Structures are given as structure tokens and as C-alpha cells.
């Protein structure tokens, strides 16, 4: 977990890039995803190619940090938690229930909205992070527990 509150500036794209770099991301990043591939296979869900590409870029980044809003003294906790969740190398046992839920009837709802095959990848966001799926064409679909709409990125 990154506990320091760091000021970020610029437009939204610039801010997101700064946050991702602070969490360990860099241009051209490619990491070993064998732990994640095994996790998916153990749950009977072989990773799609787009899921593999996404994970090679983003798996293993710091999954919890604070996002400074208007004042550095107050900051929202931000999650970038991809399955399997590893916080300081320790597995979060709630993830199996989340993965199961996101692979069942919720997945059917996402695939219907997307019109293509999708896979769950985890939770991303702050306060109430969204459940996030990736489509076979690389689009991200997010659903929050407090709204009915499915968002596409």
C-alpha cells in the first residue's frame, strides 16, 4: 500500500499516467503473469489473449494507494486490484468469492451489454471500486454496486 499523499497535476490523462507510474507502471512494461494465469486456470477460466496483454502491462502494480483530492491532508483510498489480489505478497481470501460472482450471472450481464466474450479482471476505483471485466477486443467494462448502468472504457 502506498500511504504517502502525492500531489498530481495536469489534465485527466496526465494525472492517470502519474498515478500509474507512481504505482510502478512504465512505458513498455511486461511482467511475468504465470501466477495470474494459474489462478484463472484453477478457476476453470483460461485467460483470453486480451486479458494476458492487459496483465503483462498492469499486473503486480501497487494495488492500494491514496488519491489526493483537493487537499493533501484528505485523500481517498484507491484500489487497482487485479485477480489474484496480492497485497504485499499476501493473498486476499475474499477474491475467490468475488471472482466466482463476477464469472457467473454478472458475467452474462456484462457479455450481453458488450456483445462479446468477457472476463473478470478485478476491482478498480476509489470509495466503492467498480467490478471490472475485459472484452475479447480489449475494452474494459465497469459496474458499480450502487448503479445499474454498465460503463465501457
Give the positions of each predicted feature.
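Short acidic-glycine loop/turn motifs at beta-strand connectors
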Residues: 134-137
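Compact, glycine/acidic-enriched structural inserts
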Residues: 145-153
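Short hydrophobic/aromatic-rich beta-strand segments that constitute the beta-sheet cores
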Residues: 140-143
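Short active-site-adjacent structural elements
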Residues: 129-132, 151
Amino acid at each position: 500500500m502506498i500511504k504517502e499523499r502525492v500531489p498530481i497535476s495536469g489534465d485527466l490523462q496526465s494525472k492517470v499516467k502519474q498515478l500509474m507510474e507512481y504505482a510502478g507502471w512504465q512505458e513498455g512494461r511486461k511482467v511475468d503473469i504465470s501466477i495470474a494465469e494459474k489462478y484463472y486456470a484453477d478457476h476453470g477460466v483460461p485467460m483470453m489473449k486480451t486479458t494476458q496483454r492487459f496483465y503483462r502491462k498492469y499486473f503486480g502494480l501497487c494495488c492500494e494507494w491514496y488519491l489526493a483530492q483537493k487537499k493533501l491532508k484528505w485523500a481517498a483510498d484507491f484500489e487497482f486490484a487485479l485477480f489474484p489480489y496480492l497485497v504485499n505478497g499476501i493473498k486476499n481470501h475474499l477474491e475467490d468469492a468475488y471472482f466466482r460472482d463476477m464469472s457467473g450471472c454478472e458475467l452474462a450481464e456484462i457479455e450481453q451489454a458488450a456483445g462479446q466474450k468477457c472476463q473478470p479482471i478485478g476491482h478498480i476505483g476509489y470509495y466503492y471500486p467498480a467490478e471490472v471485466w475485459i472484452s475479447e477486443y480489449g475494452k474494459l467494462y465497469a459496474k458499480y454496486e450502487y448503479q445499474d448502468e454498465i460503463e465501457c472504457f
